[in-house]
Amino acid sequence: MATDKEYLEYVKDQLSEAEGVSFRPMMGEYIMYTGGKVAGGIYDNRLLVKPTASAKALMPDAPYELPYEGAKEMLLVDNLDDRQFLRELLTAMYEELPEKKKK
């Protein structure tokens, strides 16, 4: 099941206070970048982020979910109504995310 455009727009709006966040469509879903680094994505109308140490610390009870068959597990972000939390989450994760791979 692909992500609805309405859900994408809702998540974008909720993340509007976080700097450097962008999305790129990929096979009906959306990869989320923060400062040019892959932080997670929107899969089947769910916001999932990489399980960095800071993400696990800020969301200790967040369930791990698969974005798609064969992928690595990611953390489900279910606190989408709190814009400040979302900004803090992505800011905290940034330094732990791997640099963009050179081609």
List each language-model region with its residue ranges.
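Charge-dense, helix-prone N-terminal extensions
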Residues: 1-103
